[in-house]
């Protein structure tokens, strides 16, 4: 691994443009958004509906960047920071794999440059100030039963989904129901990822909805005078992090909102700075095209004024077989063919946005030639560009064919949005459900309708950031492949007025995950020489 300062110098940066975090990590100045103004090409990486283990989207993003470098392209990648929850939960580390990783992987996976702790601290500071205000006389007349801002922690802990605070003597504060969300679902995480500078950051923080008064009036962070101290905690967290891939490609790793319960992409400032310094930027969006990619098209690219010049859609034989209903071990060509319906629907989704995608078939050792041939023939018959990706095993060399296909697909596309910003919220939600998920319609619970009414009273033209299972186009994780004849049910709607969007809660989605029966944490250890093992 090279010293990060060598890579920074190759990027043409001076010492005023960055701060070192040891030998291998750095933070970049926000002022780099204003230099060069290159007309870089932005390539978005998304996926088909995933299995629980994921389909290798991060690995593909990293490997594709390395393949671009081998072809002599001036390229950087942009991915999200890992959350401790999944690292210790079901997926383990989230820094790629094999010969396509970002380094130093153990540092990045475990706390990195301190962004997540800073975001958690800023979030919980507001929670503390809300309760403190109520305790010291409650001048704003906040209703303790109508506090809408939760607490946060970067850990999977189902016991924190619903709690009671203030239990004990009177000096413990008011007794009230409360809850935690995981840090990637925090509105402060979303705000950090969507802010362009410190002024923008403070403005967004000031608009966070804390709760309502006993007379049903909204109370915001600005009313509690919280935004300044919150922004102070986030000063360094807003600056994007730079590391490197296995083969020395510059890698922006910044912010970490989940794609199923938040907007699911790395920060806007990371993408904007990368596009000023490089000719090609490859950025990743969480889960399938119905989640992270939809939000990138409809929210992130709008706020950041970002182009989308190509889309890579990651697929695996494993996921195709799952959606095809495979019940057996080993080769199952018929299941691959049946599961292709899911992949084709994701292709159709990307085409609706006005972009022609390239499918990256992420190869696993268990894949057979017959299975690969079967899906290849289907993609060919539909006129879909595709390539086998072997970047896990071979690094950049294993992504050369994919890189060439992606380069040939790059264009100045006119993006077609799912909804207009000025449309009412019900219409926006229905358009996403029908046009992206393939639903027959939307069922709004009474609470959801009340939430929407309140959101439209206190927000101007908000975006919609759906919270939905990643395992199905529907809101039911058991409806695999290409479901039809369903309606999605909106249980409630969270108001993220600071971030500028509402979050409709579909089905049984949880904003605080739990650990599995055998969490990855059981396999992680620290050796006597200080090496961390079992994380990947």
UniProtKB/Swiss-Prot annotation:
Annotated pathway, please?
A: One-carbon metabolism; tetrahydrofolate interconversion
> What top-tier enzyme class does this entry carry?
ligase
Instruction: Give yes or no: UniProt keyword ATP-binding.
Output: yes
PROSITE patterns in the cross-refs: FTHFS_1, FTHFS_2
Might you name a Gene Ontology BP term for this protein? tetrahydrofolate interconversion
- Which EC numbers characterise this protein's activity in its record? 6.3.4.3
Provide the residue positions that the database annotates as binding ATP: 51-58
Any Pfam family the entry gives: FTHFS
The answer, when asked if Nucleotide-binding is one of the entry's keywords, is yes
Xref: Gene3D superfamilies: Domain 2, N(10)-formyltetrahydrofolate synthetase (3.30.1510.10), Formyltetrahydrofolate synthetase, domain 3 (3.10.410.10), P-loop containing nucleotide triphosphate hydrolases (3.40.50.300)
Which reactions is this enzyme annotated as catalysing?
(6S)-5,6,7,8-tetrahydrofolate + formate + ATP = (6R)-10-formyltetrahydrofolate + ADP + phosphate
Give the record's keywords alphabetically. ATP-binding, Ligase, Nucleotide-binding, One-carbon metabolism
Q: Mind listing the GO molecular function terms for this protein?
A: ATP binding; formate-tetrahydrofolate ligase activity
Similarity field: Belongs to the formate--tetrahydrofolate ligase family.
Q: Please report the name of this protein according to its UniProt entry.
A: Formate--tetrahydrofolate ligase
What is the originating organism of this protein? Thermoplasma volcanium (strain ATCC 51530 / DSM 4299 / JCM 9571 / NBRC 15438 / GSS1)
Lineage runs: Archaea, Methanobacteriati, Thermoplasmatota, Thermoplasmata, Thermoplasmatales
């Amino acid at each position: 691994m090279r010293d990060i300062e060598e890579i920074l110098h190759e990027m043409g940066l001076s010492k005023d443009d960055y701060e070192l975090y040891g030998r291998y990590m750095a933070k970049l100045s926000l002022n780099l958004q204003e230099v060069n103004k290159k007309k870089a090409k932005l390539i978005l990486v998304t996926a088909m509906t995933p299995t629980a283990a994921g389909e290798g989207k991060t690995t593909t993003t990293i490997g594709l960047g390395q393949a671009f470098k081998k072809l002599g392209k001036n390229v950087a990648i942009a991915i999200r920071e890992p959350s401790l929850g999944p690292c210790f939960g079901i997926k383990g580390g989230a820094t790629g794999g094999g010969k396509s990783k970002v380094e130093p992987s153990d540092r990045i996976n475990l706390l990195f440059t301190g962004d997540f702790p800073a975001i958690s601290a800023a979030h919980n500071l507001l929670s503390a100030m809300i309760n403190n205000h109520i305790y010291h006389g409650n001048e704003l007349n906040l209703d303790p039963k109508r506090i809408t801002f939760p607490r946060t922690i970067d850990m999977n802990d189902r016991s924190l989904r619903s709690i009671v605070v203030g239990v004990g003597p009177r000096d413990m504060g008011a007794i009230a129901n409360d809850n935690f969300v995981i840090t990637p679902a925090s509105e402060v995480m979303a705000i950090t990822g969507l802010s362009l500078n410190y002024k923008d950051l403070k403005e967004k923080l000031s608009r966070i909805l804390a709760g309502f008064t006993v007379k049903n009036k909204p109370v915001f962070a600005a009313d509690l005078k919280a935004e300044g101290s919150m922004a102070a905690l986030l000063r360094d967290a807003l600056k994007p992090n730079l590391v490197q891939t296995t083969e020395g490609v510059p890698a922006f790793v910044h912010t970490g909102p989940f794609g199923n319960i938040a907007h699911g992409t790395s920060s806007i400032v990371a993408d904007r700075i990368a596009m000023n310094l490089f000719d090609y930027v490859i950025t990743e969006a969480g889960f399938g095209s119905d989640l992270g990619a939809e939000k990138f098209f409809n929210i992130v690219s709008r706020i950041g004024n970002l182009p989308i010049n190509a889309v890579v859609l990651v697929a695996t034989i494993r996921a195709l077989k799952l959606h095809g209903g495979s019940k057996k071990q080993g080769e199952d060509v018929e299941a691959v063919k049946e599961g292709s319906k899911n992949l084709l629907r994701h292709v159709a989704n990307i085409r609706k946005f006005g972009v022609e995608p390239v499918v990256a078939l992420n190869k696993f050792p268990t894949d057979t030639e017959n299975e690969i041939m079967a899906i290849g023939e289907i993609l060919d018959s539909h006129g879909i560009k595709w390539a086998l990706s072997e970047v896990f095993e071979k690094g950049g060399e294993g992504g050369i064919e994919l890189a060439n296909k992606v380069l040939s697909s790059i264009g100045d596309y006119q993006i077609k949005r799912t909804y207009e910003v000025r449309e009412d919220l019900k219409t926006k939600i229905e358009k996403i459900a029908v046009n992206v998920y393939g639903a027959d319609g939307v069922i709004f619970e009474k609470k959801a309708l009340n939430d929407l009414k309140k959101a439209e009273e206190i927000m101007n033209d908000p975006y919609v950031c759906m919270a939905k299972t990643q395992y199905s186009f529907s809101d039911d994780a058991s409806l695999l492949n290409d479901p039809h004849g369903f309606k999605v049910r909106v249980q409630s709607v969270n108001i993220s007025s600071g971030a500028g969007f509402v979050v409709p809660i579909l089905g049984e989605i949880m904003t605080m995950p739990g650990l599995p029966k055998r969490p990855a944490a059981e396999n992680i250890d620290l050796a006597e020489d200080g090496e961390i093992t079992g994380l990947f």
